[in-house]
Amino acid sequence: MKQPGPNETRVYVWDLFVRIFHWTLVVCIFLNFFYTEAGEKPHEVLGYVAAGFVIARLIWGFIGSPYARFSKWFASPRTVYLYLKNFRTREIYTSHNPIAGWMMVFLMLCVLSLGLTGFLLGTDTFFGEPWIQDTHKWISNIMMGGVALHVTGALYESYHEKRNLIASMVHGYKNK
């Protein structure tokens, strides 16, 4: 890990709950997409764990530590526009940058939508209903595209900012 330079300070950004949330989602999504069988109990349990963690994270986004709060990193469309317009000389954010903030919202909405469609598939009314199954699969594939963009963005920003963003999601600290 890069040590803070003479003009940098180390900041505790990602609290324990945020990091547990993040890595729990990584495991649940990875296992459900690549290993478990749709409709089987492990797939359901992992899906409900992921959806439950997203609900808890939404609550934490209002009452949690300062960098966990949506008010700290949820950007207006104008802020996103200015960020993209000045992409080469853009500001470096301690928390999520404007694009990453919107990506977090997108991924959380995907997980909640998967939880809802997965739940519906387990009900008598919608069990085996093709349009719900297709919607569930469609959302899953779109979410995995978002995950790929998220990982690519984190790697790119780690290179651009010269600080390991993935490691910060392990130990919680970023150099500012």
Segments from the language model and where they lie:
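Membrane-embedded alpha-helical bundles that constitute the cytochrome b-like, heme-associated redox core
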Residues: 1-176
